[in-house]
UniProtKB/Swiss-Prot annotation:
Residues engaged in binding Na(+): G161, C164, T167
Job of this protein: Protease subunit of a proteasome-like degradation complex believed to be a general protein degrading machinery.
Superkingdom, taxonomy of origin: Bacteria
Record protein name field: ATP-dependent protease subunit HslV
Main location: cytoplasm
EC number(s) stated in the UniProt entry for this protein: 3.4.25.2
GO biological process per UniProt: proteolysis involved in protein catabolic process
Catalysed transformations (reactions): ATP-dependent cleavage of peptide bonds with broad specificity
The UniProt record lists the keyword Hydrolase: yes
Entry keyword Kinase: no
Complex formation: A double ring-shaped homohexamer of HslV is capped on each side by a ring-shaped HslU homohexamer. The assembly of the HslU/HslV complex is dependent on binding of ATP.
Organism: Campylobacter lari (strain RM2100 / D67 / ATCC BAA-1060)
Keywords: Allosteric enzyme, Cytoplasm, Hydrolase, Metal-binding, Protease, Sodium, Stress response, Threonine protease
């Protein structure tokens, strides 16, 4: 498990949201409280976040962004191509990072072994040391509250930040809304 962060992605009825905390840890020490581990890609039509080694994650972001561009913004194709590249490249197979990527149609977890996983419910995914806390909170809030998508992500990450020592409550979110 990566003791680095918590990233939560939620694909709701009207919006897709990704959120992450701001803590950067090195061993038992907090190095930074306001890091941004999420990004907008493809002119804001795709959202992505990472957990794990920061240097490795930036390499993965760059590679994924190139594949997304070459696939003309097709997230599914880019995710599959990403997995193929990851498995072919010996250097990439040693990277210690995971990513979540989503648009209004899909949400994928890209694992450190090159796997591409779409969550069973197709709506909620989380990674990082606080990922299971955030995922549990998001599932409960999605089922038992009337929170909008962005507030659901924020509240879920808040809960994870209160439980996981590698996650803080300095939360950043990005949103994709349906075209009106």
């Amino acid at each position: 498990m990566f003791h680095a962060t918590t990233i939560l992605a939620y694909k709701g009825k009207n919006k897709s949201v990704i959120g992450g905390d701001g803590q950067v840890s090195f061993g038992n020490t907090v190095l930074k409280n306001n890091a941004v581990k999420i990004r907008k890609l493809n002119n804001g039509k795709v959202l992505a976040g990472f957990a794990g080694s920061t240097a490795d994650a930036f390499n993965l972001f760059d590679m994924f962004e190139k594949l997304l561009s070459s696939s003309k913004g097709d997230l599914l194709k880019a995710a599959i191509d990403f997995s193929k590249e990851w498995r072919k490249d010996k250097y990439l197979r040693k990277l210690e990072a995971m990513m979540l990527v989503l648009d209004r149609n899909h949400i994928f977890l890209l694992s450190g072994t090159g796997d591409v996983v779409e969550p069973e419910d197709g709506a909620i995914a989380a990674i990082g040391s606080g990922g299971n806390y955030a995922l549990s909170a998001a599932r409960a809030l999605a089922k038992h509250s009337n929170l909008d998508e962005e507030n659901l992500v924020k509240e879920s990450l808040q809960i994870a930040g209160e439980i996981c020592i590698y996650t803080n409550t300095n939360i950043k979110t990005y949103v994709i809304e349906d075209d009106k």
